[in-house]
């Protein structure tokens, strides 16, 4: 596959609950984020997703939708996966 680098659009977004998790339970944060990104890579061909190594960007992700894919649909898919982790339960 050949991709014209000028046509690639990369988005950055933050998931607040994951940023909060990093502040309180950093080891759990890393475990969940690594598993989440791996799962999304294995089960979706609609986008590429990754995290930043800079820990000041905990909770931030970059995503590159496949050509013709809508970023709103991509974000909905990602949030469905995040919701499945039931992260809110760790704060009760």
UniProtKB/Swiss-Prot annotation:
One of its GO terms (biological process) is symbiont-mediated evasion of host restriction-modification system. It comes from the Viruses. Keywords: Endonuclease, Host-virus interaction, Hydrolase, Inhibition of host innate immune response by virus, Nuclease, Restriction-modification system evasion by virus, Viral immunoevasion. One of its GO terms (molecular function) is endonuclease activity. Pays a role in the inhibition of the host restriction-modification system. Strongly inhibits the host mcrA endonuclease that cleaves 5-methyl and 5-hydroxymethylcytosines at the specific DNA sequence C(me)CGG. This is Anti-restriction endonuclease. The gene is arn.
């Amino acid at each position: 596959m050949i991709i014209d680098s000028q046509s690639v659009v990369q988005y950055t977004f933050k998931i607040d609950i994951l940023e909060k998790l990093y502040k309180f339970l950093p080891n759990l944060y890393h475990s969940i984020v690594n598993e989440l990104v791996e799962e999304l890579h294995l089960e979706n061909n609609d986008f590429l997703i990754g995290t930043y190594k800079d820990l000041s960007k905990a909770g931030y992700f970059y995503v590159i939708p496949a050509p013709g894919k809508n970023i709103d649909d991509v974000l909905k898919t990602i949030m469905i996966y995040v919701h499945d982790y039931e992260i809110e339960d760790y704060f009760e």
